[in-house]
Amino acid sequence: FQMQELHRQYEDYCIELGIESYLLGARYSKFGYYGESFFDVKYRALEEEQQLTETLFQFLTSMTMREIKLQDEELLFESCQQFIGLWWQEGYEKGERRYRLKLH
């Protein structure tokens, strides 16, 4: 039971940060709609995106029950970056589509 509860906490927090990242991308999509390139918008949001990545990484490393090797830690950080980045991009694309369709 305890392990199942721990997994649920991991899932809930990951989902929460995925949603935050999605909403962040959607919020920044207005800049893309008004003509900024995707990469310029991504750079504009970089600090907030990095904060979400750091938050997720810190949570996952603080919840482990064993010492993490440096190599594993680097892989985990990269996974956190990809997770946050993919949800940011998904939110950005959907948000830009909403702007084009005048649904904002």
Walk through the language-model features, giving the residues of each:
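Intrinsic-disorder/low-complexity detector
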Residues: 1-104
